[in-house]
């Protein structure tokens, strides 16, 4: 049953037109030459796989910050949030998750809260695995405020192949932890700026699963009584 469920996983709506195009081209290729058609079948299946949008089980305990993306934790550094959010120069711990073309590219909210600001900034399309991609590449930043007033920043960053950032939320939108808020095509990166003082619970090289992997526990930074 689990295997059947994985095969029948729905795709994100951003993939619908691509699936139609790939399928149409496949039909034409079959008409031209049968072996070419089978190549088209493989590419169509890859398209469906790329845009897959599986359900996730998100931990619900207060204070947890979950991964917004599937991929590999490739950087954990200290940095200031994007200047377009207007948060000043206060340094936070930044956890970067790199998505290759085989990862699920649907992005999910790292915490429950209200979107206070959405800021898009055009830029380059460097390899998203590079540290400087955070500053140089095209990006879309979200400032999310939890009910307790704590603010978390998540940044969608375009990559060498990714040329399309999709964000489905606007300022004032209330998000649940793990809720889908966007997607990036094809291969990219997400940065999460943790609450001040929060200690990351992941390590560089670790595999992260969107909406499930816990990046940090901000409650643990509160002073003990």
Swiss-Prot record:
Its cofactor is pyruvate. GO terms for biological process: phosphatidylethanolamine biosynthetic process. Its EC number is 4.1.1.65. The record marks 187-188 as: Cleavage (non-hydrolytic). GO terms for molecular function: phosphatidylserine decarboxylase activity. Heterodimer of a large membrane-associated beta subunit and a small pyruvoyl-containing alpha subunit. Belongs to the phosphatidylserine decarboxylase family. PSD-A subfamily. Catalyzes the formation of phosphatidylethanolamine (PtdEtn) from phosphatidylserine (PtdSer). This is Phosphatidylserine decarboxylase proenzyme. It comes from Parvibaculum lavamentivorans (strain DS-1 / DSM 13023 / NCIMB 13966).
């Amino acid at each position: 049953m689990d295997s059947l469920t994985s095969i029948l996983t729905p795709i994100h709506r951003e993939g619908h037109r691509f699936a139609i195009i790939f399928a149409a081209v496949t039909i034409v290729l079959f008409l031209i030459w049968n072996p070419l058609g089978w190549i088209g079948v493989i590419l169509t299946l890859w398209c469906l796989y790329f845009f897959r949008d599986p359900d996730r089980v998100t931990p619900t305990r207060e204070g947890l910050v979950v991964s917004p993306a599937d991929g590999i934790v490739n950087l954990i550094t200290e940095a200031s949030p994007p200047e377009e959010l207007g948060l000043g120069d206060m340094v936070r711990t930044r956890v970067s998750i790199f998505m290759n073309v085989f990862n699920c590219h649907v992005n999910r909210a790292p915490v429950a809260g209200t979107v206070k600001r959405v800021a898009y900034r055009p830029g380059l399309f460097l390899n998203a695995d590079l540290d400087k991609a955070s500053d140089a590449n095209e990006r879309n930043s979200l400032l999310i405020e939890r009910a307790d007033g704590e603010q978390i920043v998540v940044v969608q960053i375009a990559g060498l192949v990714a040329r399309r950032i999709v964000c489905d939320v606007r300022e004032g939108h209330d998000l649940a932890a793990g809720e889908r808020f966007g997607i990036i095509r094809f291969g990219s990166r997400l940065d999460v700026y943790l609450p001040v003082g929060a200690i990351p619970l992941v390590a560089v090289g670790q595999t992260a699963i969107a909406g499930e992997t816990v990046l940090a526990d901000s409650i643990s930074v509160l002073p003990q009584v």
